[in-house]
Amino acid sequence: MRFTALATAILPLACNVLALPAKTGEAPKLDVSLSQVDNTLIKAVVKNTGSEDITFVHLNFFRDKAPVKKVSLFRNATELPFQGIKQRFRTEGLTEDALTVLAPGESIEDEFDIAATSDLSEGGSITISTDGFVPIATGNKITGSVPYSSNELSIEVDAAQAASVASAVKPLDKRTKVASCSGTRSSALSTALKNTVSLANAAASAAQSGSSSRFQEYFKTTSSSVRSTVAARFRAVASEASSTSSGSTTYYCTDTYGYCSSNVLAYTLPAYNIIANCDIYYTYLSALTRTCHAQDQATTTLHEFTHAPGVYSPGTDDLGYGYDAATALSSSQALNNADTYALFANAVNLNC
């Protein structure tokens, strides 16, 4: 990892799915209906199909204005690379603009252009779908999660039209003036990287040959091949975090692309292997928590490293955010979920 940590840059989903019981009728769930508006412009209608109001966090989800991953795109059963951002957000003190409330039967709509976050200039047949768990909140704190899933939408993409869509994320001009990270932020990030190395190495050992019940708890299998894969990703994270002058990623201690908000801790641009911290990474998070399943600077950095394909390919997604959502995933989903790795490392460190 190259530790540039600049003020301006120079290089090119929650908890407790069972914590929201339905009193009567349908269990809490969001249904996502995907349809094609025009070529690569897609509309999602998100409907509360349960019997109670749901207040959910729409960061990394529909209604998020940032270029986040809202759907998965497939060509001939192979997923296409995502070229937007993946962000980690706070679990407490969420501001109202991060929350959406849906009454039973109520829905919201979101239109977005999939060509803005994936290269579709080849055109042809594309299949689109999404599923996972979205965080729910009570009193501005994440207190659970609900599942969501969509229909499978197949479309024919006009190559020329898709190529004309501007990319949502562009590499920054290399001529941009550089201002190096220093002072307390530099010190905090250096400490976080050292802690990340320790956490990832310990997690790698635990994944490879530690408690099978703990591994089952987080990754929903005790398969030796899966344990080896998880251990390999953790070792790759430890290796990447151990150097500030080499590696596959570039890590900034400030908001390189302007995607931070009052709720976002850090984000990754997987297409460029760039990671950036936000202001609240330093003000909201402790260096290393002593609480099981809690967030801190080290596990946030570890979480972001798992998103970067340059560290270990393929990079992870955000399919379940927080302990209960992450542990509700299937084994294949958990293997591809950033927070599962952060939570497992936290559990190994604190013997949760």
Swiss-Prot record:
InterPro entries reported for this sequence: Fungal_M35_metalloproteases (IPR050414), Lys_MEP (IPR029463), MetalloPept_cat_dom_sf (IPR024079), Peptidase_M35 (IPR001384)
EC number(s) per entry: 3.4.24.39
The organism's place on the tree of life at top rank: Eukaryota
UniProt catalytic activity: Preferential cleavage of bonds with hydrophobic residues in P1'. Also 3-Asn-|-Gln-4 and 8-Gly-|-Ser-9 bonds in insulin B chain
Cofactor detail note: Binds 1 zinc ion per subunit.
Propeptide regions on this chain: 20-175
CDD domains per record: M35_deuterolysin_like
Subcellular localization: Secreted
Signal peptide: 1-19
Example GO BP: proteolysis
Cofactor(s) needed: Zn(2+)
Recorded GO CC terms: extracellular region
Cystine connections: 181-253, 260-278
Family to which this protein belongs: Belongs to the peptidase M35 family.
Record protein name field: Neutral protease 2 homolog ATEG_04941
Lineage: Eukaryota, Fungi, Dikarya, Ascomycota, Pezizomycotina
